[in-house]
Amino acid sequence: MILNERQYMITKAQIKKFQSAIENLEKKVPPQDNKNEQLRHQSYLASLNGEIEELSEQVEEYEKLKTQQIEKLECNSLEELPEALIKARIFRGLTQGQLAKLLNVKEQQVQRDEANQYANSSFTKILKVQRALDIEIKEEVIFK
């Protein structure tokens, strides 16, 4: 998941590098009689294409959040809440630094919290983030 503009730019650059690598690989087709080289070549191409697809999905999601092209975020369990908070920050157009100011903490703290998916954060902190983002979280308690 892309957390900020810096990661967004890095991810887009990575996609270009992978695309360039694919173009170079496609110019170097192994001989027909060398099946091992052909399989290795195809495997490498598939791997690069898979990386491009995954990174492109992350870029697309980040762009949709930044341009507010979504109506709501799905949060089907508490495990998904940290990612939903990060996405809500991006949707609101806030940088990590701006959220930090709203929370009266240092930007590095927000960066750590998001990088760790709020793993070490108290419930009180998560509520503060939710309030700062001005979002409503609805969850059902289901008995199994």
Task: Give, region by region, the residue ranges found by the protein language model.
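N-terminal flexible/basic segments that precede or flank functional cores
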Residues: 1-78
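Short, amphipathic alpha-helical "recognition" segments used to contact nucleic acids or chromatin
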Residues: 79-91
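Short alpha-helical DNA-recognition segment
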Residues: 93-113
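Short, solvent-exposed alpha-helical "recognition" segments
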Residues: 116-123
